[in-house]
Protein backbone atom coordinates (compact mmCIF):
# COMPACT_ATOMS: atom_id res chain seq x y z
CA UNK A 1 0.00 0.00 0.00
CA UNK A 2 1.36 3.34 -1.01
CA UNK A 3 1.34 6.39 1.22
CA UNK A 4 0.74 4.66 4.49
CA UNK A 5 1.03 7.84 6.48
CA UNK A 6 -1.40 10.07 4.64
CA UNK A 7 -3.79 10.23 1.72
CA UNK A 8 -2.40 11.43 -1.57
CA UNK A 9 -2.66 15.09 -2.44
CA UNK A 10 -5.33 15.74 -5.04
CA UNK A 11 -7.63 12.93 -3.86
CA UNK A 12 -10.47 15.37 -3.10
CA UNK A 13 -10.02 17.15 -6.43
CA UNK A 14 -10.07 13.84 -8.27
CA UNK A 15 -13.18 12.70 -6.41
CA UNK A 16 -15.09 15.91 -7.15
CA UNK A 17 -14.05 15.77 -10.80
CA UNK A 18 -15.33 12.20 -10.97
CA UNK A 19 -18.66 13.20 -9.38
CA UNK A 20 -19.11 15.91 -12.01
CA UNK A 21 -18.36 13.34 -14.72
CA UNK A 22 -21.03 11.04 -13.28
CA UNK A 23 -23.69 13.76 -12.84
CA UNK A 24 -22.82 16.85 -14.95
CA UNK A 25 -26.34 18.35 -14.64
CA UNK A 26 -27.76 17.11 -11.33
CA UNK A 27 -24.68 17.90 -9.23
CA UNK A 28 -24.61 21.66 -10.11
CA UNK A 29 -28.35 21.87 -9.32
CA UNK A 30 -27.76 20.23 -5.94
CA UNK A 31 -24.90 22.65 -5.25
CA UNK A 32 -27.23 25.58 -5.98
CA UNK A 33 -29.75 24.19 -3.47
CA UNK A 34 -27.00 23.72 -0.87
CA UNK A 35 -25.75 27.29 -1.34
CA UNK A 36 -29.31 28.68 -1.17
CA UNK A 37 -30.02 26.72 2.00
CA UNK A 38 -26.78 27.91 3.63
CA UNK A 39 -27.36 31.57 2.71
CA UNK A 40 -30.91 31.62 4.06
CA UNK A 41 -29.82 30.02 7.34
CA UNK A 42 -27.27 32.82 7.77
CA UNK A 43 -29.49 35.90 7.43
CA UNK A 44 -31.99 35.79 10.36
CA UNK A 45 -29.66 38.14 12.26
CA UNK A 46 -30.33 40.86 9.66
CA UNK A 47 -34.08 40.61 10.25
CA UNK A 48 -33.53 40.53 14.01
CA UNK A 49 -31.47 43.71 13.79
CA UNK A 50 -34.12 45.46 11.69
CA UNK A 51 -36.97 44.41 13.99
CA UNK A 52 -35.10 45.57 17.12
CA UNK A 53 -34.25 48.84 15.36
CA UNK A 54 -37.95 49.41 14.56
CA UNK A 55 -38.90 48.66 18.16
CA UNK A 56 -36.23 51.13 19.38
CA UNK A 57 -37.52 53.76 16.98
CA UNK A 58 -41.11 53.55 18.20
CA UNK A 59 -40.26 52.87 21.86
CA UNK A 60 -40.45 56.52 22.83
CA UNK A 61 -43.75 57.27 21.04
CA UNK A 62 -45.38 53.91 21.86
CA UNK A 63 -46.96 54.12 18.40
CA UNK A 64 -47.02 50.36 17.82
CA UNK A 65 -49.62 50.67 15.09
CA UNK A 66 -47.09 52.54 12.95
CA UNK A 67 -44.44 49.88 13.64
CA UNK A 68 -46.73 46.93 12.88
CA UNK A 69 -46.59 47.11 9.02
CA UNK A 70 -42.78 47.13 8.99
CA UNK A 71 -42.49 44.30 11.50
CA UNK A 72 -45.17 42.27 9.70
CA UNK A 73 -43.42 42.74 6.35
CA UNK A 74 -40.08 41.60 7.81
CA UNK A 75 -41.66 38.55 9.44
CA UNK A 76 -43.47 37.56 6.22
CA UNK A 77 -40.26 37.87 4.21
CA UNK A 78 -38.50 35.70 6.76
CA UNK A 79 -41.29 33.09 6.57
CA UNK A 80 -41.05 33.00 2.76
CA UNK A 81 -37.28 32.61 2.94
CA UNK A 82 -37.59 29.77 5.45
CA UNK A 83 -40.12 28.03 3.20
CA UNK A 84 -37.69 28.41 0.31
CA UNK A 85 -34.92 27.03 2.51
CA UNK A 86 -37.10 24.04 3.40
CA UNK A 87 -37.74 23.31 -0.28
CA UNK A 88 -34.06 23.72 -1.13
CA UNK A 89 -33.09 21.43 1.76
CA UNK A 90 -35.49 18.73 0.58
CA UNK A 91 -34.26 19.06 -3.02
CA UNK A 92 -30.60 18.83 -2.07
CA UNK A 93 -31.21 15.83 0.24
CA UNK A 94 -33.12 14.00 -2.49
CA UNK A 95 -30.53 14.89 -5.13
CA UNK A 96 -27.61 13.88 -2.92
CA UNK A 97 -29.23 10.49 -2.30
CA UNK A 98 -29.34 9.90 -6.06
CA UNK A 99 -25.79 11.17 -6.55
CA UNK A 100 -24.40 9.16 -3.64
CA UNK A 101 -25.91 5.80 -4.51
CA UNK A 102 -25.40 6.29 -8.24
CA UNK A 103 -21.76 7.29 -7.75
CA UNK A 104 -21.08 4.30 -5.50
CA UNK A 105 -22.67 2.00 -8.08
CA UNK A 106 -20.47 3.42 -10.84
CA UNK A 107 -17.43 3.36 -8.56
CA UNK A 108 -18.00 -0.32 -7.78
CA UNK A 109 -18.34 -0.98 -11.51
CA UNK A 110 -15.05 0.82 -12.16
CA UNK A 111 -13.33 -1.15 -9.41
CA UNK A 112 -14.69 -4.48 -10.61
CA UNK A 113 -13.83 -3.75 -14.25
CA UNK A 114 -10.31 -2.74 -13.24
CA UNK A 115 -9.99 -5.88 -11.14
CA UNK A 116 -10.89 -8.00 -14.18
CA UNK A 117 -8.09 -6.31 -16.13
CA UNK A 118 -5.42 -6.88 -13.48
CA UNK A 119 -2.78 -9.57 -13.97
CA UNK A 120 -2.75 -12.74 -11.89
CA UNK A 121 0.35 -11.40 -10.17
CA UNK A 122 -1.75 -8.75 -8.40
CA UNK A 123 -3.99 -11.36 -6.74
CA UNK A 124 -0.99 -13.50 -5.84
CA UNK A 125 0.67 -10.58 -4.04
CA UNK A 126 -2.37 -8.96 -2.36
CA UNK A 127 -4.44 -10.32 0.50
CA UNK A 128 -7.91 -11.27 -0.73
CA UNK A 129 -9.57 -9.93 2.41
CA UNK A 130 -7.86 -6.59 1.89
CA UNK A 131 -9.19 -6.52 -1.68
CA UNK A 132 -12.69 -7.24 -0.35
CA UNK A 133 -12.26 -4.32 2.04
CA UNK A 134 -12.25 -1.98 -0.97
CA UNK A 135 -15.83 -3.03 -1.75
CA UNK A 136 -17.10 -2.91 1.84
CA UNK A 137 -15.31 -0.67 4.31
CA UNK A 138 -13.76 1.81 1.87
CA UNK A 139 -16.96 2.15 -0.16
CA UNK A 140 -18.89 2.80 3.07
CA UNK A 141 -16.53 5.59 4.16
CA UNK A 142 -16.85 7.04 0.65
CA UNK A 143 -20.64 6.95 1.02
CA UNK A 144 -20.47 8.97 4.23
CA UNK A 145 -18.07 11.41 2.59
CA UNK A 146 -20.32 12.08 -0.43
CA UNK A 147 -23.71 12.01 1.29
CA UNK A 148 -22.90 13.80 4.56
CA UNK A 149 -19.42 15.18 5.07
CA UNK A 150 -18.94 17.18 1.86
CA UNK A 151 -22.46 18.77 1.85
CA UNK A 152 -22.28 19.64 5.54
CA UNK A 153 -18.76 21.02 5.16
CA UNK A 154 -19.90 23.15 2.22
CA UNK A 155 -22.93 24.45 4.14
CA UNK A 156 -20.82 25.30 7.17
CA UNK A 157 -18.17 27.09 5.09
CA UNK A 158 -20.77 29.17 3.23
CA UNK A 159 -22.49 30.02 6.51
CA UNK A 160 -19.19 31.10 8.08
CA UNK A 161 -18.34 33.35 5.12
CA UNK A 162 -21.84 34.87 5.05
CA UNK A 163 -21.95 35.57 8.79
CA UNK A 164 -18.44 37.01 8.64
CA UNK A 165 -19.62 39.44 5.95
CA UNK A 166 -22.65 40.46 8.03
CA UNK A 167 -20.48 40.98 11.11
CA UNK A 168 -18.09 43.09 9.07
CA UNK A 169 -21.05 45.17 7.90
CA UNK A 170 -22.32 45.84 11.44
CA UNK A 171 -19.24 46.22 13.68
CA UNK A 172 -15.55 45.72 13.00
CA UNK A 173 -14.69 46.10 16.70
CA UNK A 174 -16.85 43.19 17.78
CA UNK A 175 -15.73 41.22 14.74
CA UNK A 176 -12.12 41.70 15.83
CA UNK A 177 -12.94 40.13 19.20
CA UNK A 178 -14.61 37.18 17.45
CA UNK A 179 -11.66 36.68 15.09
CA UNK A 180 -9.20 36.53 17.98
CA UNK A 181 -11.21 33.70 19.52
CA UNK A 182 -11.64 31.94 16.16
CA UNK A 183 -7.89 32.14 15.49
CA UNK A 184 -7.30 30.25 18.72
CA UNK A 185 -9.92 27.70 17.65
CA UNK A 186 -8.12 27.19 14.33
CA UNK A 187 -4.84 26.51 16.14
CA UNK A 188 -6.53 23.80 18.22
CA UNK A 189 -8.27 22.36 15.14
CA UNK A 190 -5.04 22.15 13.16
CA UNK A 191 -3.20 20.48 16.01
CA UNK A 192 -5.86 17.87 16.74
CA UNK A 193 -7.00 17.41 13.12
CA UNK A 194 -3.55 16.63 11.76
CA UNK A 195 -3.11 13.90 14.36
CA UNK A 196 -6.48 12.31 13.61
CA UNK A 197 -5.84 12.34 9.84
CA UNK A 198 -2.71 10.25 10.28
CA UNK A 199 -4.48 7.64 12.38
CA UNK A 200 -7.66 7.54 10.25
CA UNK A 201 -5.66 6.33 7.24
CA UNK A 202 -3.84 3.78 9.40
CA UNK A 203 -7.24 2.65 10.68
CA UNK A 204 -8.41 1.97 7.10
CA UNK A 205 -5.29 -0.08 6.43
CA UNK A 206 -5.76 -2.02 9.69
CA UNK A 207 -9.39 -2.79 8.77
CA UNK A 208 -8.28 -4.26 5.45
CA UNK A 209 -5.59 -6.31 7.21
CA UNK A 210 -8.10 -7.66 9.76
CA UNK A 211 -10.64 -8.61 7.11
CA UNK A 212 -7.88 -10.28 5.12
CA UNK A 213 -6.81 -12.34 8.14
CA UNK A 214 -10.39 -13.47 8.85
CA UNK A 215 -10.92 -14.43 5.19
CA UNK A 216 -7.67 -16.39 5.18
CA UNK A 217 -8.54 -18.32 8.34
CA UNK A 218 -12.06 -19.09 7.08
CA UNK A 219 -10.62 -20.61 3.90
CA UNK A 220 -8.06 -22.60 5.89
CA UNK A 221 -10.30 -23.64 8.78
CA UNK A 222 -9.88 -27.36 8.07
CA UNK A 223 -6.10 -27.01 8.16
CA UNK A 224 -6.34 -25.13 11.46
CA UNK A 225 -8.43 -27.97 12.93
CA UNK A 226 -6.22 -30.75 11.56
CA UNK A 227 -3.09 -29.28 13.14
CA UNK A 228 -4.87 -28.18 16.36
CA UNK A 229 -3.70 -24.65 15.65
CA UNK A 230 -6.70 -22.91 17.25
CA UNK A 231 -4.75 -21.36 20.14
CA UNK A 232 -2.03 -19.92 17.89
CA UNK A 233 -4.67 -18.65 15.45
CA UNK A 234 -6.47 -16.85 18.27
CA UNK A 235 -3.20 -15.23 19.30
CA UNK A 236 -2.54 -14.12 15.72
CA UNK A 237 -6.05 -12.69 15.45
CA UNK A 238 -5.70 -10.90 18.78
CA UNK A 239 -2.51 -9.27 17.50
CA UNK A 240 -4.19 -8.05 14.29
CA UNK A 241 -7.34 -7.02 16.17
CA UNK A 242 -5.31 -5.14 18.79
CA UNK A 243 -3.59 -3.19 16.02
CA UNK A 244 -7.00 -2.19 14.60
CA UNK A 245 -8.19 -1.30 18.11
CA UNK A 246 -5.14 0.89 18.70
CA UNK A 247 -5.45 2.75 15.38
CA UNK A 248 -9.22 3.23 15.84
CA UNK A 249 -8.79 4.50 19.39
CA UNK A 250 -6.10 6.95 18.37
CA UNK A 251 -8.11 8.25 15.40
CA UNK A 252 -11.38 8.63 17.29
CA UNK A 253 -9.71 9.95 20.44
CA UNK A 254 -8.45 12.98 18.57
CA UNK A 255 -11.67 13.32 16.57
CA UNK A 256 -14.01 13.06 19.57
CA UNK A 257 -12.13 15.52 21.76
CA UNK A 258 -12.24 18.27 19.13
CA UNK A 259 -15.96 19.12 19.15
CA UNK A 260 -16.34 19.50 22.96
CA UNK A 261 -13.23 21.71 23.08
CA UNK A 262 -14.53 23.95 20.31
CA UNK A 263 -18.02 24.16 21.85
CA UNK A 264 -16.63 25.33 25.17
CA UNK A 265 -14.32 27.79 23.45
CA UNK A 266 -17.37 29.10 21.58
CA UNK A 267 -19.28 29.58 24.83
CA UNK A 268 -16.37 31.49 26.34
CA UNK A 269 -16.13 33.63 23.22
CA UNK A 270 -19.88 34.39 23.47
CA UNK A 271 -19.38 35.78 26.98
CA UNK A 272 -16.32 37.79 25.89
CA UNK A 273 -18.23 39.36 22.97
CA UNK A 274 -21.15 40.20 25.29
CA UNK A 275 -18.78 41.92 27.72
CA UNK A 276 -17.01 43.77 24.91
CA UNK A 277 -20.31 44.91 23.40
CA UNK A 278 -21.60 46.10 26.77
CA UNK A 279 -18.41 48.03 27.50
CA UNK A 280 -18.50 49.70 24.07
CA UNK A 281 -22.15 50.68 24.57
CA UNK A 282 -21.58 52.08 28.05
CA UNK A 283 -18.45 53.98 27.03
CA UNK A 284 -20.14 55.46 23.96
CA UNK A 285 -17.21 54.44 21.77
CA UNK A 286 -17.70 55.17 18.07
CA UNK A 287 -18.59 52.16 15.94
CA UNK A 288 -16.42 51.18 12.98
CA UNK A 289 -18.50 49.40 10.35
CA UNK A 290 -19.37 49.26 6.66
CA UNK A 291 -22.97 50.18 7.48
CA UNK A 292 -22.02 53.45 9.18
CA UNK A 293 -24.53 52.74 11.96
CA UNK A 294 -23.77 53.56 15.56
CA UNK A 295 -23.32 50.71 18.01
CA UNK A 296 -26.66 49.98 19.70
CA UNK A 297 -28.76 47.23 21.23
CA UNK A 298 -30.14 46.43 17.74
CA UNK A 299 -26.59 45.56 16.63
CA UNK A 300 -25.18 44.01 19.81
CA UNK A 301 -27.97 41.46 20.39
CA UNK A 302 -27.95 40.04 16.82
CA UNK A 303 -24.15 40.08 16.95
CA UNK A 304 -24.21 37.78 19.97
CA UNK A 305 -26.48 35.34 18.12
CA UNK A 306 -24.21 35.53 15.07
CA UNK A 307 -21.22 34.80 17.31
CA UNK A 308 -22.85 31.62 18.57
CA UNK A 309 -23.84 30.60 15.04
CA UNK A 310 -20.39 31.50 13.71
CA UNK A 311 -18.58 29.43 16.35
CA UNK A 312 -21.03 26.57 15.92
CA UNK A 313 -20.29 26.38 12.22
CA UNK A 314 -16.56 26.66 12.86
CA UNK A 315 -16.99 23.63 15.11
CA UNK A 316 -19.00 21.88 12.39
CA UNK A 317 -16.24 22.57 9.88
CA UNK A 318 -13.69 21.09 12.26
CA UNK A 319 -15.90 18.09 12.99
CA UNK A 320 -16.62 17.43 9.31
CA UNK A 321 -12.92 17.73 8.51
CA UNK A 322 -12.36 14.54 10.52
CA UNK A 323 -15.09 12.76 8.54
CA UNK A 324 -13.65 14.11 5.31
CA UNK A 325 -10.19 12.85 6.27
CA UNK A 326 -11.58 9.39 6.97
CA UNK A 327 -13.55 9.40 3.72
CA UNK A 328 -10.52 10.54 1.74
CA UNK A 329 -8.51 7.70 3.26
CA UNK A 330 -11.07 5.27 1.82
CA UNK A 331 -11.18 7.15 -1.50
CA UNK A 332 -7.39 7.07 -1.70
CA UNK A 333 -7.38 3.29 -1.29
CA UNK A 334 -10.06 2.94 -3.96
CA UNK A 335 -8.11 5.15 -6.37
CA UNK A 336 -5.00 3.09 -5.66
CA UNK A 337 -6.89 0.05 -6.98
CA UNK A 338 -8.14 1.97 -10.02
CA UNK A 339 -4.58 3.16 -10.69
CA UNK A 340 -3.11 -0.34 -10.73
CA UNK A 341 -1.52 -1.15 -14.07
CA UNK A 342 -3.82 -3.41 -16.12
CA UNK A 343 -2.56 -6.56 -17.75
CA UNK A 344 -0.89 -5.69 -21.05
CA UNK A 345 -1.53 -7.63 -24.23
CA UNK A 346 0.48 -6.93 -27.38
CA UNK A 347 -0.65 -10.08 -29.14
CA UNK A 348 -2.20 -9.93 -32.59
CA UNK A 349 -2.58 -13.61 -33.53
CA UNK A 350 -6.16 -14.74 -32.91
CA UNK A 351 -7.99 -18.07 -32.74
CA UNK A 352 -10.72 -18.52 -35.37
CA UNK A 353 -13.02 -21.18 -36.77
CA UNK A 354 -11.65 -22.58 -40.01
CA UNK A 355 -12.40 -25.04 -42.78
CA UNK A 356 -10.43 -26.58 -45.59
CA UNK A 357 -10.94 -25.41 -49.16
CA UNK A 358 -8.74 -26.72 -51.94
CA UNK A 359 -6.29 -28.07 -49.40
CA UNK A 360 -5.93 -24.72 -47.58
CA UNK A 361 -7.35 -23.41 -44.33
CA UNK A 362 -9.78 -20.49 -44.62
CA UNK A 363 -11.61 -18.61 -41.90
CA UNK A 364 -15.34 -19.20 -41.54
CA UNK A 365 -18.12 -17.91 -39.32
CA UNK A 366 -19.88 -21.21 -38.67
CA UNK A 367 -18.77 -23.62 -35.98
CA UNK A 368 -16.50 -26.38 -37.24
CA UNK A 369 -14.26 -28.96 -35.65
CA UNK A 370 -11.22 -27.09 -36.92
CA UNK A 371 -9.55 -24.21 -35.11
CA UNK A 372 -6.74 -22.16 -36.60
CA UNK A 373 -4.40 -19.37 -35.62
CA UNK A 374 -5.01 -16.27 -37.73
CA UNK A 375 -1.63 -14.60 -38.21
CA UNK A 376 -1.65 -11.19 -39.95
CA UNK A 377 1.69 -10.00 -41.37
CA UNK A 378 2.22 -6.24 -41.27
CA UNK A 379 5.06 -6.32 -43.80
CA UNK A 380 2.95 -7.27 -46.82
CA UNK A 381 -0.58 -7.24 -45.36
CA UNK A 382 -1.05 -10.96 -45.91
CA UNK A 383 -2.76 -13.36 -43.49
CA UNK A 384 -1.75 -16.96 -42.83
CA UNK A 385 -3.63 -19.66 -40.96
CA UNK A 386 -2.00 -22.34 -38.80
CA UNK A 387 -4.07 -25.28 -37.58
CA UNK A 388 -4.40 -25.56 -33.81
CA UNK A 389 -2.79 -28.87 -32.89
CA UNK A 390 -1.37 -28.28 -29.41
CA UNK A 391 2.36 -28.42 -30.10
CA UNK A 392 4.04 -26.69 -27.14
CA UNK A 393 7.78 -26.04 -26.93
CA UNK A 394 9.83 -24.20 -24.30
CA UNK A 395 13.34 -23.22 -25.32
CA UNK A 396 15.95 -21.98 -22.82
CA UNK A 397 13.32 -20.31 -20.64
CA UNK A 398 14.30 -18.18 -17.63
CA UNK A 399 11.68 -16.92 -15.18
CA UNK A 400 11.39 -15.41 -11.72
CA UNK A 401 8.38 -14.07 -9.82
CA UNK A 402 10.83 -11.44 -8.65
CA UNK A 403 13.17 -10.16 -11.40
CA UNK A 404 16.07 -10.40 -8.96
CA UNK A 405 15.42 -14.05 -8.14
CA UNK A 406 15.22 -16.52 -11.05
CA UNK A 407 13.34 -19.73 -10.13
CA UNK A 408 13.46 -21.40 -13.57
CA UNK A 409 16.69 -21.29 -15.54
CA UNK A 410 17.42 -22.56 -19.05
CA UNK A 411 14.33 -24.79 -19.15
CA UNK A 412 13.73 -26.54 -22.48
CA UNK A 413 10.98 -29.09 -23.12
CA UNK A 414 8.30 -29.96 -25.61
CA UNK A 415 4.89 -31.63 -25.78
CA UNK A 416 3.81 -32.83 -29.20
CA UNK A 417 0.13 -32.99 -30.22
CA UNK A 418 -1.57 -35.87 -28.41
CA UNK A 419 1.44 -36.53 -26.22
CA UNK A 420 0.98 -36.79 -22.45
CA UNK A 421 3.69 -35.17 -20.35
CA UNK A 422 3.81 -35.34 -16.54
CA UNK A 423 5.75 -32.96 -14.32
CA UNK A 424 6.86 -34.65 -11.12
CA UNK A 425 8.66 -32.84 -8.34
CA UNK A 426 8.56 -31.49 -4.82
CA UNK A 427 6.38 -28.56 -3.85
CA UNK A 428 7.89 -25.39 -5.26
CA UNK A 429 9.80 -27.19 -8.00
CA UNK A 430 8.00 -25.18 -10.68
CA UNK A 431 5.28 -27.53 -11.96
CA UNK A 432 2.45 -25.02 -11.69
CA UNK A 433 4.78 -22.21 -12.71
CA UNK A 434 5.34 -23.81 -16.12
CA UNK A 435 1.58 -24.02 -16.78
CA UNK A 436 1.24 -20.40 -15.68
CA UNK A 437 3.90 -19.40 -18.20
CA UNK A 438 2.19 -21.27 -21.04
CA UNK A 439 -1.03 -19.39 -20.21
CA UNK A 440 0.94 -16.13 -19.98
CA UNK A 441 -0.27 -15.44 -16.48
CA UNK A 442 3.35 -14.37 -16.11
CA UNK A 443 5.83 -13.35 -18.80
CA UNK A 444 9.21 -15.06 -19.06
CA UNK A 445 12.47 -13.21 -18.46
CA UNK A 446 14.34 -14.89 -21.31
CA UNK A 447 13.95 -17.65 -23.88
CA UNK A 448 10.91 -18.54 -25.98
CA UNK A 449 7.68 -20.47 -25.67
CA UNK A 450 6.16 -21.55 -28.98
CA UNK A 451 2.64 -22.82 -29.48
CA UNK A 452 2.09 -24.53 -32.84
CA UNK A 453 5.27 -22.81 -33.95
CA UNK A 454 4.05 -19.34 -32.92
CA UNK A 455 5.73 -17.31 -30.17
CA UNK A 456 3.02 -17.05 -27.50
CA UNK A 457 3.87 -13.35 -27.02
CA UNK A 458 2.32 -12.81 -30.47
CA UNK A 459 -0.95 -14.55 -29.53
CA UNK A 460 -3.70 -12.50 -27.90
CA UNK A 461 -4.00 -13.68 -24.30
CA UNK A 462 -7.75 -14.28 -24.44
CA UNK A 463 -7.37 -16.53 -27.52
CA UNK A 464 -4.35 -18.30 -26.05
CA UNK A 465 -6.18 -19.14 -22.83
CA UNK A 466 -9.33 -20.11 -24.75
CA UNK A 467 -7.33 -22.77 -26.56
CA UNK A 468 -6.07 -24.33 -23.33
CA UNK A 469 -7.91 -26.40 -20.75
CA UNK A 470 -6.86 -26.29 -17.10
CA UNK A 471 -7.98 -28.41 -14.18
CA UNK A 472 -7.04 -26.44 -11.08
CA UNK A 473 -5.82 -27.97 -7.84
CA UNK A 474 -8.56 -26.15 -5.92
CA UNK A 475 -12.16 -26.55 -7.04
CA UNK A 476 -13.86 -23.23 -7.72
CA UNK A 477 -17.66 -23.09 -7.97
CA UNK A 478 -19.74 -19.98 -8.52
CA UNK A 479 -23.20 -19.25 -7.17
CA UNK A 480 -25.68 -20.56 -9.77
CA UNK A 481 -27.00 -23.83 -11.13
CA UNK A 482 -24.82 -26.87 -11.74
CA UNK A 483 -25.50 -26.46 -15.46
CA UNK A 484 -24.29 -22.84 -15.40
CA UNK A 485 -21.07 -23.85 -13.66
CA UNK A 486 -20.35 -26.56 -16.24
CA UNK A 487 -21.10 -24.09 -19.04
CA UNK A 488 -18.63 -21.55 -17.60
CA UNK A 489 -15.85 -22.60 -19.99
CA UNK A 490 -18.10 -22.45 -23.06
CA UNK A 491 -21.03 -20.06 -22.65
CA UNK A 492 -22.77 -21.17 -25.86
CA UNK A 493 -22.63 -24.88 -25.00
CA UNK A 494 -25.93 -26.75 -25.22
CA UNK A 495 -27.42 -28.68 -22.31
CA UNK A 496 -26.51 -31.92 -24.09
CA UNK A 497 -22.86 -30.84 -24.36
CA UNK A 498 -22.78 -29.95 -20.66
CA UNK A 499 -24.28 -33.31 -19.69
CA UNK A 500 -21.78 -35.06 -21.97
CA UNK A 501 -18.92 -33.23 -20.25
CA UNK A 502 -20.29 -34.28 -16.85
CA UNK A 503 -20.40 -37.91 -18.01
CA UNK A 504 -16.78 -37.74 -19.16
CA UNK A 505 -15.79 -36.33 -15.76
CA UNK A 506 -17.73 -39.06 -13.95
CA UNK A 507 -20.01 -36.51 -12.26
CA UNK A 508 -23.31 -37.30 -14.01
CA UNK A 509 -24.60 -39.85 -11.49
CA UNK A 510 -23.75 -37.59 -8.57
CA UNK A 511 -25.45 -34.59 -10.20
CA UNK A 512 -28.65 -36.48 -10.99
CA UNK A 513 -28.99 -37.36 -7.30
CA UNK A 514 -29.13 -33.68 -6.35
CA UNK A 515 -32.59 -32.26 -5.49
CA UNK A 516 -32.99 -30.46 -8.84
CA UNK A 517 -30.38 -32.33 -10.83
CA UNK A 518 -28.48 -30.06 -13.19
CA UNK A 519 -30.73 -27.14 -12.19
CA UNK A 520 -29.77 -27.36 -8.51
CA UNK A 521 -28.57 -23.95 -7.32
CA UNK A 522 -25.25 -24.18 -5.48
CA UNK A 523 -23.65 -21.57 -3.27
CA UNK A 524 -20.20 -20.16 -3.92
CA UNK A 525 -17.53 -22.87 -3.57
CA UNK A 526 -20.29 -25.50 -3.24
CA UNK A 527 -20.84 -25.02 0.48
CA UNK A 528 -24.40 -26.45 0.23
CA UNK A 529 -23.40 -29.63 -1.62
Show which residues each predicted segment covers.
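Alpha-helical segments in transporter systems
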Residues: 25-50, 74, 78, 93-97, ...
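Transmembrane helix-loop-helix hairpins at lipid-water interfaces of multipass membrane proteins
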Residues: 25-91, 168-173, 275, 283-294
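An intracellular "coupling" helix at the cytosolic face of ABC transporter transmembrane type-1 domains
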Residues: 21-24, 120-121, 139-146, 150, ...
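Helix-loop-helix
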Residues: 58-59, 166-180, 254-332, 337-341, ...
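Juxtamembrane helix-loop junctions of ABC transporter transmembrane domains
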Residues: 2-8, 40-56, 60, 81-128, ...
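Membrane-integrated ABC transporters
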Residues: 1-41, 55-74, 92-96, 100, ...
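Transmembrane helices of ABC transporter permease
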Residues: 22, 26-39, 148-201, 275-295
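ABC-type nucleotide-binding domain
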Residues: 64, 354-529
